[in-house]
């Protein structure tokens, strides 16, 4: 069960209640505003005692108001005040249950994340580093026009249209340069692998 909070409302919650006096709404929404003005302080105090957290109080209050507004004045039955209190209480109880579920499930979530992080691939091995170094050297050996296209297209992952615009060439030319660069890189890396 939640701890019993102090009955003194924090400033932010008092500001919510005080703001109800100056609120201006359409005529068809006056019913909800009158409920909020009449019972606002009491339900916010109820939520404060129930939840003990300003943010949770505001969330529950907003949830209840949104649900009541969506339901409409006619959907509240013969006792709108009682319905208002019940809606606010239900919103508060939902937050308490969500906290309970969070506390119950959080250790399992942490364990899954820990296992997932252990399953991730280990840092690059020596072979991978050597291969990356060879690829970098091969890219540096390419002619400038091919190197520019391969860097922009493959490393920066830009679309051909943007690569072409940056380099001042046509899309088809960018595609052709990329193809040529890949063929040359494959040849260079293959030559180094099979001397």
Where in this protein do the model-derived segments appear?
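Helix-turn-helix DNA-binding module
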Residues: 140, 144, 148, 156-173
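Sigma70-family region 2
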Residues: 25, 52, 62-80, 98-100
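DNA-recognition helix of helix-turn-helix
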Residues: 89, 161, 167-193
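A short, charge-rich alpha-helical start-of-domain segment used by transcription regulators
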Residues: 19-45, 55
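Short helix-capping/turn signature of helix-turn-helix
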Residues: 39-40, 49-50, 151-158
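Acidic, proline/glycine-rich intrinsically disordered inter-domain spacer in sigma factors
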Residues: 21-22, 30, 111-140
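Short, small-hydrophobic-rich alpha-helical interface motif
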Residues: 43, 47, 57-68, 84-87, ...
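Arg/Lys-rich amphipathic alpha helix in sigma70-family domain 2
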Residues: 86-108, 128
């Amino acid at each position: 069960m939640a701890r019993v909070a102090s009955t003194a409302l924090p400033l932010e919650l008092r500001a919510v209640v005080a703001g109800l006096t100056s609120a201006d709404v359409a005529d068809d929404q006056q019913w909800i505003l009158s409920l909020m003005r009449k019972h606002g302080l009491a339900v916010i105090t109820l939520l404060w005692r129930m939840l003990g957290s300003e943010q949770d109080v505001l969330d529950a209050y907003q949830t209840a108001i949104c649900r009541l507004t969506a339901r409409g004045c006619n959907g509240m039955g013969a006792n709108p005040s009682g319905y208002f209190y019940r809606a606010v209480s239900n919103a508060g109880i939902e937050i308490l249950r969500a906290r309970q579920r969070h506390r119950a499930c959080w250790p399992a979530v942490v364990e899954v994340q820990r296992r997932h992080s252990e399953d991730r691939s280990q840092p690059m091995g020596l072979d991978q580093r050597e291969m990356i170094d060879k690829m970098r050297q091969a890219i540096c050996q390419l002619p400038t026009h091919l190197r520019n296209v391969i860097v922009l297209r493959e490393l920066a992952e830009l679309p051909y249209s943007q690569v072409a615009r940056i380099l001042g060439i046509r899309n088809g030319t960018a595609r052709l340069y990329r193809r040529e660069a890949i063929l040359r890189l494959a040849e260079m890396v293959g030559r180094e692998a099979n001397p």
